Amino acid sequence: YTPLCGTGNKPVRRILSELGFKHVYVVPEQENPDPNFTTLDYPNPEDPKAFTYALRLAKEKDADIVLATDPDADRLGVYAKDTKTGEYVAFTGNMSGMLIAEYILREKTATGAMPENPALVTTIVTTNMTKPITEAYGVKLIEVLTGFKFIGEQIGFLEAEGHPERYIFGFEESYGYLSGAHVRDKDAVNAVMLACETAAYYAAQGMSLLDAVNALYREFGFYRNALGSFTFEGETGMHKMQGIMAGLRTSAPKTIAGYEVAEVVDYDTDGTGLPRADVLEYRLVNGAKLMVRPSGTEPKIKVYLSAVANSEEAADAINTAMADAAKDLSLIHI
């Protein structure tokens, strides 16, 4: 485990100790807060480079999983050992989220702890794999706009109705997770606990986290996600971004990557049931989707890709084709 020179060290070690995890190895070079982040180019658990020291220690200790929390301990990155090759495989936020979600739903169902009318909350750009998983367990799936504050808002709504226990779990693709209604934001300490508990559950069955993910893919379908972005610098760039979004609304593509567009959802209208937002979603006949939105913090247009197929390779190929098509659409010319 590495707190990436941030605040996660003490609370993470404490919670794992209280849960009985005895073989926890903390990266010594990144154990204590360091405002200069001397050992890191960028202290972000989404960046593979941030795991350099942790992966080195993991190989030395033959660890099963590798965890990194960001400096303010609200996001969690995960690597898991491939027992066939001995290498460590990076989990996306979607992979970690759906694995933990399915484990929580499985255990609550098995122990009779599932509340009435349970709900799981994700964002509109998070993996579609949550749909068949929640359907399998009879759990309502609530999709909200991008940003964990909207997941927290749903907890508030349930609390206002007098039923906060209905909230089971929430996550977003950008490495944010939360179980329970104790806070209103993503919580990496909570997520570490859930990841380790999930890993222990599968280890007791002789499975690694990677084995578990692949088993879920085989059961529910190979859902794969990808993210691309296009940068537009300066004031002219902002105008160009606005023009691109306007152009998409007036002349939406009929096909993307050779697949017919079955439905277009414009979140900047009143018909979605969500607050209006500058987001466009293209749902294709093959179950894939492409979403386009301007970044709220950078001069970028982000493109979210999601595909499902009968193999990982086939789903990745669809996403690659959609990414190539996005570059050619009249909306995005760099």
Region roles according to the model:
Residues 50-53, 100, 150:
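Well-ordered alpha-helical segments embedded in enzymatic catalytic cores
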Residues 12, 74-93, 130:
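Short Gly/Thr/Asp-enriched flexible loops that form oxyanion-binding sites at enzyme active sites
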Residues 59, 63-65, 87-89, 107-293, ...:
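Phosphate-binding and adjacent anionic-ligand microenvironments
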Residues 20-78:
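N-terminal small/polar loop signature for handling phosphorylated ligands or for N-terminal nucleophile
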Residues 3-9, 73-75, 125-128, 235, ...:
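Gly/Ser/Thr-rich loops at beta-strand to alpha-helix junctions
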Residues 1-21, 28-30:
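Active-site pocket-lining segments that scaffold enzyme catalytic pockets across diverse folds
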Residues 89-104:
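Catalytic or ion-translocation cores adjacent to nucleophile or general acid/base/metal-coordination motifs
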